[in-house]
Amino acid sequence: MKAAGRLLGVLATACAALAVLASCAREDKNDRIVLGFSQIGAESEWRTANTESIKSAAATMGIDLRFADAQQKQENQIKAIRSFIAQRVDVIAFSPVVETGWDTVLQEAKAANIPVILTDRSVTADPSLFAGFIGSDFVEEGRKAGRWVVEKFKDGTDDVNIVELQGTVGAGPAIDRKKGFEEIIAANPRFKIIRSQSGDFTRTKGKEVMEAFLKAETRKIDVLYAHNDDMAIGAIQAIEEAGKRPGRDILIVSIDAVKGAFEAMIAGKLNVTIECNPLLGPQLMTSVTEIVAGRPIPKRIVVEEQVFPMETAKQHMQSRKY
């Protein structure tokens, strides 16, 4: 009987110790939120600023960030999300490289009871599969670019020939920025997009595609519309190498408003940039903490943004954070 009593005592002590350890583990997990984030890559100045904002905000708010760079490949993002599910992170967030093809992996996250937040770009999947989307209104960005072009040529009567450097094929910003721009210029038949091709949001590809436009096009090119600043900066080099003056012989409108664009505007080589704010880190981390606390977040969080013509570039340059 005494031996049995001692055994029961040992078991009780062991159980109590296990309970304490489990409690500590839960407290540690609750004290430090774990966020799995899949980034598209590092294809532009904008993306670099976006990544820095996310990492900085996570550190400031004490969130354990598990970061994965997809190198602009959807299959890498899907692998990363599945890895986050296996790790049982508290929240998953990602900037989708393209709009389609996410349903299966998002359903897997939902089945694991791990909420998902989309940043920068959205998807075409069932909205019930993600908690919310934080990012810009890409259609409106395209409209702003279109309005600037229409206003610039409002007093003329000649046709306005436009070449377009699109973003990554299938990416939300590329689809929406094209849609918004075309929506505005469609009202006036003078404005014609005579060539349009993907520059994949990169400086190198932007230069390459612009070189091809300049060699193949016999008509005068009046405007270059680039879906981001990096492609525009690459195209500027191609225009100069072709013996033309960017910003004068060919007017250039682009999107993002990174420092490189302001430098190009100050140099007179880029006419206007439409802001797309990459500093989404604080909003993302706030949303993550809200979700973990059991509070809902808005399904759509839109970032406010401005238009910066070259005439205002100098006065805004010093205050730019990216």
Question: What are the language-model segments listed below?
Answer:
Residues 100-140, 151, 161, 258-266, ...:
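Flexible loop/hinge segments that line or gate small-molecule binding clefts
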